[in-house]
Amino acid sequence: KITKKMIKILDCTIRDGGYYTNWDFDKTLVDQYIFSTNELPIDYLEVGYRSYPMKGYLGKYFYAPIYELENLKKNSIKKLVIILNEKDIRLEHINDLLGPIVGIIDMVRIAIDPEHLGRALILAEGVKKMGFEVGFNVMYMSKWSQYGNFISELKNVDSIADYFYMVDSFGGVYPKDVIETIDLVRSNTSCKLGFHGHNNLELALINTLTAIEHGVDIVDATISGMGRGAGNLKTELLLTALNAKEGLDVNFNALGTVVNAFDGLLEKYQWGTNLPYMISGSNSLPQKDVMDWVTTRFYSFNSIIRALQNQKAKVKDNERLPVFEAKDTASEVLIIGGGKTAVEHAQGLIELIKSKPELIVIHASSKNATHYKGLANKQIFCLVGSEGHRLEKAFEDLGEFDGLCVLPPFPRKMGTYVPSSVKEKSFELAFIDFTEKHKDSHTALALQTAISLNAN
């Protein structure tokens, strides 16, 4: 049977879940989390970052203030952990950041880019001398073979790190990869091993169980899988599996209570995998952009997937178009958006348009274009993201289309889709210079087009 001495479990809900809440958590929730985990076979709780002030707002658990750590220490019977971002922290910073928490925090983990392992060793040696356990969270596990001397340098970890974590940053490894990586690391270091999985392909559980079966010493999980992008292995799933498979003693009342406590956040943020995360995981592409695109709900899945395909191909964009040069100018333009008022007032707007033959109509979105078919006035259609698909629907595969299409300047971060039948009528703006914000939005594209037409 598995006991806590055979495999250690680290729950990093507060730290990894902070990517959704900006590291703000309600005190009542944190108190319940601490109370419940006291009753569960979890060894470590990772409760945030320690950092100097960063640009923009980041919540309490990104900085893990001393008063909060003291409160957690008072209430938790578990070992407490914070993590440092190696890219932001140097040896000369650790006395300020870690000195005040000696005796409060048990382990300091360091998030490490494999490219900077040597630099991380210097930082970690200083952390170790302060009396902390040290964990190396080495990212981009699926790409380690691309990092020159990284594997051969692992021998230098032995005397410094207590745990060397294999981090599946992209959520794209399979059990076979886990086994091969464990063997590879073991052949170069005697450090205890850990595994941190992501759930893009819903393999976090099997990958973690595989890691346990092949002798890793510590594994990570989070309540309800709360974590960056597609999320992590669910703590409740891991504990349930180990209870059934290995007889690990689990207090299911306490487990159910803490899972229920996070239901509100799960409903609000809806973390978990979806098609874009599956594609990014399968192709070892960064989750940060995907998380931004998915959570804002501004981009369609087609746009996100096209952007990911461009990343995989290492191209800025999949298509370049001729630059839009306004052959006609218009003292007046009418910009029609995708809202319901453009439908409600279509009849009146059509009468206005007909009364002004020189007026140019700019469709910020093609959503309502069907209501404005057949006009003699020149019409321009802004194609942002997957608007090309919407245009096809509006004009029945574009058999009735008589207009121009304008796209944002090259490169377009979400890639390019232009229906083949209108490609010869499609152009890209040379620039958008009237604003620095939301340059890839429908509104910005429509307004810059109007400016290009010298509209008043």
Where are these regions (language model features)?
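Catalytic cores and adjacent flexible loops of soluble metabolic enzymes
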Residues: 1-331
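Short, basic, glycine/proline-bearing loop/turn elements
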Residues: 16-20, 329-339, 376-378, 428-435
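Flexible, charged surface loops at secondary-structure boundaries
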Residues: 38-39, 74-76, 101-103, 158, ...
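Acidic/polar N-terminal loop/beta-strand segments that form early-domain functional surfaces
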Residues: 47-52, 83-85, 337-339, 364-367, ...
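Gly/Ser/Thr-rich loops at beta-strand to alpha-helix junctions
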Residues: 113-117, 171, 200-201, 228, ...
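Glycine-rich phosphate/pyrophosphate-binding loops
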Residues: 222, 453-456
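N-terminal glycine-/serine-/threonine-rich phosphate-binding loop
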Residues: 314-360
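Acidic/Gly/His-enriched mid-domain segments of enzyme catalytic cores or analogous surface patches
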Residues: 353-354, 359-360, 366-453
